Regions:
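Lumenal/periplasmic acceptor-binding loop at the mouth of the active site in multi-pass
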Residues: 57-60, 69-76, 257-344
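Juxtamembrane membrane-water interface segments immediately following transmembrane helices
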Residues: 15, 19, 26-61, 209-274, ...
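Multi-pass, polyprenyl lipid-linked donor-dependent membrane glycosyltransferases
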Residues: 66, 70-71, 89-100, 120-155, ...
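Short hydrophobic/aromatic helix or loop-helix immediately within or flanking a transmembrane segment
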Residues: 44-57, 61-85, 92, 96, ...
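Membrane-interface helix-loop-helix junctions at transmembrane boundaries of multi-pass membrane enzymes
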Residues: 4-10, 161-165, 198-212, 319-327, ...
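Transmembrane-helix signature of polytopic, membrane-embedded enzymes
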Residues: 88-89, 102-127, 145-146, 160-162, ...
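Transmembrane alpha-helix segments characteristic
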Residues: 20, 125, 169-174, 212, ...
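Short hydrophobic alpha-helices at membrane interfaces in multi-pass membrane enzymes
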Residues: 116-119, 154-175, 204-211
Length: 602
């Protein structure tokens, strides 16, 4: 006798109710936190709030620097209920949007893999820690997840029932996603290709679908693009910050994750603003000069995308989420990421149009996000897609386990073994792979790809160093014991930087817990065995504190410095993700490189 079937409609509304209740409880628990009530002026949250209130008063910005949906449409509409910018209207509306996103994930997974999978997908998203956590904050992540879920749902429906109505919904969803976050533009080529492939034998129907999708995509974007173009005197999209954002994750100094503003970011942005080379042109030139380094950076970003590590920005789940006991009980990325990757591996590769649409959106989101730079909140929009495939993976694993018990054949056992291997591989990628690469392989990789370290030829200065990114790299402070210590650091200077005549130079050494209220420590400095008389001072740059040693000397191909420090409580940073063998402490080789830079005046 078969068991009673689940009432799918009731199950969907149950998913919606659970999702909404969980989000409302977390909103209530976090409603008194500083980041909700009074976010810092330097955060995107306060910027969005300020812009929305100004727009409600009729003061529109000259250009839309950020993607404009959130602060030109959503927040002004939410503040109708609280003209002074109260916290509860946006929170309540974002809780509803999050719950509807769970409903969309449920229906999408049901159409792709069956109703049981759909219910599991909705429940996974309903209790996803990161999706719930961002609900109370004035950040666009919940909305971006909604647009991603709607894009996936519309694409699946269009592939299953090819008509202009679903094409129009798909175009509108892509427009909403693009107006919320710019990397959604990179989804569209694959979706357009799927439309052509699906409708190739029905040309008239395909033309209607393309026309409807294009109109629904262009019409919402056009007013913002026209506004930006008129005020910038050049053709622009809905946002004018694309070049700056692209440069944050695509430069010789850029980390794969974290928000860091290296020297090249400012130099390239200033060059573009002055009418010189565009940021895109700078990136292409650099990629041509160091193709393997560029490839390594992008592959590392692709790997980091799946990593369970949170890269906080604006808010941190470990800090801002402490006030919510419920949040600690929800599913973290380490579980959902592993299950989602597993589902992609075992369920995503079937040649059906609807499955291909889901697979494309998953791959396009992964690639388009990794093409820029990674923060924890950038992955929130991926969670609906992730939960759909996670649910499919769970159901498929259960099916193979049952099949292996019922059918004792080598094929059934092999099928289960493949699934088990895919699950273990997914767990390794999400929880261990990135750290293992950075700790064990990266020093050797960079010793091979970039043997001389980084050499920057900037308009105002030239810089040579061996360490990696400051914010999301391998830098750790090494506390020096009391007494005198000799730090050895060697630089390899490229030919174009050499000078026989004296040049003003600065040797920067990143320090920790420096007592800035006192004078810098006594320093003895030697270069290639010759004593120098540097001017020592504390220096703050790129959100880091440095001990600067300024002197004038010729620039040689090999600069071997010996820095003798005598200072209590001074920590000096060492980067364990780089090891060229060019750093020593008291004559002994270190397992990394000092975070030190040689800056040469032009």
């Amino acid at each position: 006798m078969r068991g009673k079937r689940i009432d799918f409609k009731k199950a969907c509304w149950l998913v919606f109710a659970i999702a909404l209740l969980v989000r409302l409880i977390v909103c209530w628990q976090l409603s008194g936190t500083h980041s909700v009530v009074s976010p810092s002026d330097v955060t995107d949250m306060e910027t969005y709030r300020r812009l929305a209130l100004e727009i409600r008063q009729g003061h529109w910005p000259a250009v839309f620097d950020y993607q404009p949906f959130y602060y030109t449409l959503f927040l002004p509409a939410a503040y109708v209920f609280s003209p002074k910018g109260g916290v509860w209207p946006p929170m309540l509306l974002q809780a509803l949007v999050g719950a509807f996103t769970c409903l969309l994930a449920t229906h999408t997974a049901a159409r792709l893999f069956g109703k049981t999978t759909g219910i599991i997908a909705g429940l996974l998203l309903a209790v996803s820690k990161f999706h719930v956590f961002y609900t109370p904050f004035l950040l666009l992540e919940v909305w971006f997840a909604f647009w991603t879920a709607l894009t996936l749902y519309a694409a699946v429906r269009l592939m299953q029932k090819f008509n202009w109505k679903w094409g129009m919904l798909l175009g509108a969803a892509c427009a909403g996603a693009l107006l919320t976050r710019g990397n959604a533009l990179l989804w569209t080529p694959g979706l357009a290709a799927l439309i052509l492939w699906r409708g190739w034998k029905r040309r008239k129907q395909m033309a209607a679908v393309i026309a409807a999708a294009a109109a629904a995509f262009i019409i919402p974007i056009a007013p913002y693009s026209i506004h930006n173009s008129l005020n910038s005197n050049k053709l622009c999209g809905a946002s004018v910050a694309g070049g700056k954002v692209l440069s944050l994750g695509n430069s010789p100094e850029a980390p794969a994750g974290g928000l860091e503003y290296p020297r090249t970011y400012y130099a390239w942005a200033e060059d573009e603003a002055a009418g010189g080379k565009t940021v895109a042109r700078h990136i292409l030139d650099w990629a041509k000069s160091e193709p393997l380094v560029f490839l390594e950076q992008k592959c590392r970003a692709l790997l980091l995308f799946w990593d369970a590590t949170e890269i906080p920005n604006n808010v941190s789940i470990d800090v801002d989420g402490k006030a919510s006991p419920l949040l600690r009980l929800l599913l973290p990325w380490s579980i959902l990421g592993a299950l989602g990757l597993f589902g992609l591996l075992v369920c995503g590769w079937k040649p059906r149009a609807s499955r291909l649409a889901a697979l494309w959106l998953a791959l396009a989101f992964w690639g388009s996000t990794s093409a820029f730079y990674l923060l924890a909140r950038f992955r929130v929009g991926f969670l609906p897609v992730l939960c759909v495939f996670a649910a499919a993976g769970i159901v498929e694993l259960c099916r193979r386990i049952v099949q292996s018990k019922r059918i004792h054949t080598p094929r059934a056992r092999n099928s289960l073994s493949v699934a088990a291997f895919a699950l273990l591989f997914s767990i390794y990628v999400v929880d261990f792979a990135h750290d293992a690469y950075c700790q064990d392989l990266m020093p050797r990789v960079f010793r091979s790809l970039r043997p001389q370290g980084i050499a920057l030829d900037l308009p105002s200065e030239r810089v040579v160093y061996d360490h990696g990114p400051l914010g999301f790299g391998g830098g750790v402070p090494l506390e020096l014991d009391d007494g005198s210590h000799t730090l050895g650091k060697s630089f390899r200077v490229k030919d174009g930087f050499l000078s026989e005549s004296p040049v003003r130079q600065r040797l920067l050494l990143r320090v920790h817990h420096a007592r800035r209220q006192f004078a810098p420590p006594g320093v003895t400095l030697r270069s290639n065995g010759e004593p120098l008389r540097p001017r020592a001072y504390w220096h703050t740059e790129r959100s880091a504190q440095w001990l600067a040693l300024e002197f004038t000397a010729p620039v040689r191909r090999t600069e071997d410095f010996e820095i003798v420090l005598d200072e209590r409580g001074l920590g000096v940073f060492i980067d364990l993700q780089r090891n060229y063998g060019r750093s020593t402490l008291d004559g002994e080789a270190l397992p990394g490189e000092w975070v030190a830079e040689l800056v040469l005046d032009r």
